[in-house]
Amino acid sequence: MTRDQVAEELPNLAESKLTALVVDDSFVNQTIHQKLLNRLGIKNDVVTNGKEAVDVYCSGGNYDLILMDMDMPIMNGIQATKRLREMGIESKIAGVTTRANEGEKKEFMEAGLNDFQEKPLTISKLLSILHKLNFYVQT
């Protein structure tokens, strides 16, 4: 996505009613993901592992988008994605990770991801996720 395309998209997303859950054990990555989501006007919350993400949904939480790390303690992203899909959760899940060989990426996708991006997440990569998952704001 070019800089002009990003600039063109930002005003449309600023009015967004989208919600996102950031699932990552790294404070640095949590902060980056939150800043990018905030920049696009997407309300977001953060949890530090897959079990916490599952617990949020078990408690009635619901989000349009989940940004899921793969490598986390307690319950990793693959396990959490599988569990959420087994629960019938239809939120779009994008895997966002630094560590992914082809086998791991395939396993993560097969767990129920809708998209996958390598870290570091950038505004362009986030907009790519939103477009691929058909999150468009009607103006």
Curated annotation (Swiss-Prot):
<comment type="similarity">
    <text>Belongs to the ARR family. Type-A subfamily.</text>
</comment>
<keyword id="KW-0932">Cytokinin signaling pathway</keyword>
<dbReference type="InterPro" id="IPR052048">
    <property type="entry name" value="ST_Response_Regulator"/>
</dbReference>
<keyword id="KW-0805">Transcription regulation</keyword>
<dbReference type="InterPro" id="IPR011006">
    <property type="entry name" value="CheY-like_superfamily"/>
</dbReference>
<keyword id="KW-0804">Transcription</keyword>
<dbReference type="GO" id="GO:0009736">
    <property type="term" value="P:cytokinin-activated signaling pathway"/>
</dbReference>
<feature type="modified residue" description="4-aspartylphosphate">
    <location>
        <position position="69"/>
    </location>
</feature>
<protein>
    <recommendedName>
        <fullName>Two-component response regulator 24</fullName>
    </recommendedName>
</protein>
<keyword id="KW-0539">Nucleus</keyword>
<keyword id="KW-0902">Two-component regulatory system</keyword>
<dbReference type="GO" id="GO:0005634">
    <property type="term" value="C:nucleus"/>
</dbReference>
<dbReference type="InterPro" id="IPR001789">
    <property type="entry name" value="Sig_transdc_resp-reg_receiver"/>
</dbReference>
<dbReference type="Pfam" id="PF00072">
    <property type="entry name" value="Response_reg"/>
</dbReference>
<dbReference type="GO" id="GO:0000160">
    <property type="term" value="P:phosphorelay signal transduction system"/>
</dbReference>
<feature type="domain" description="Response regulatory">
    <location>
        <begin position="19"/>
        <end position="134"/>
    </location>
</feature>
<keyword id="KW-0597">Phosphoprotein</keyword>
<comment type="function">
    <text>Functions as a response regulator involved in His-to-Asp phosphorelay signal transduction system. Phosphorylation of the Asp residue in the receiver domain activates the ability of the protein to promote the transcription of target genes. Type-A response regulators seem to act as negative regulators of the cytokinin signaling.</text>
</comment>
